[in-house]
Amino acid sequence: MQKLLLILTILLALILITLVISLPRENQQFFSETRSTIGKSGYWETNFFKKIILLIVSILLFLTLIFYMIQTA
């Protein structure tokens, strides 16, 4: 059981790294006015499906690590 959890954790981590690398970088504008961003797409509107998959994989990795910690305690 522990080998399976370890392999699953490694696979989820590699998938998570690949997804993060494949996403384009977002521009950060700390100094701009709020009026200048009106009409521009929000964070979730660009690459929506990649970001949803990234969110799901990170939650699965977190839950797998929690379960692995419970099993080994």
Swiss-Prot record:
Membrane topology: Single-pass membrane protein
Signal peptide residues on this chain, from the entry's feature table: 1-30
Transmembrane segments: 52-72
Entry GO CC: plasma membrane
Alphabetical keyword list: Cell membrane, Membrane, Protein transport, Signal, Translocation, Transmembrane, Transmembrane helix, Transport
Compartments in which it is found: Cell membrane
Biological processes per GO annotation: protein transport
UniProt note: phenotype after gene disruption: No export of mature cell wall protein GspB, a small amount of unprocessed protein is exported to the cell wall while the rest accumulates intracellularly, probably in a glycosylated form. Cells bind less well to platelets.
InterPro entries in the record: Asp5
Function: Part of the accessory SecA2/SecY2 system specifically required to export GspB, a serine-rich repeat cell wall protein encoded upstream in the same operon.
Subunit structure: Part of the accessory SecA2/SecY2 protein translocation apparatus required to export cell wall protein GspB.
Protein name: Accessory secretory protein Asp5
Species of provenance: Streptococcus gordonii
Classification of source organism: Bacteria, Bacillati, Bacillota, Bacilli, Lactobacillales
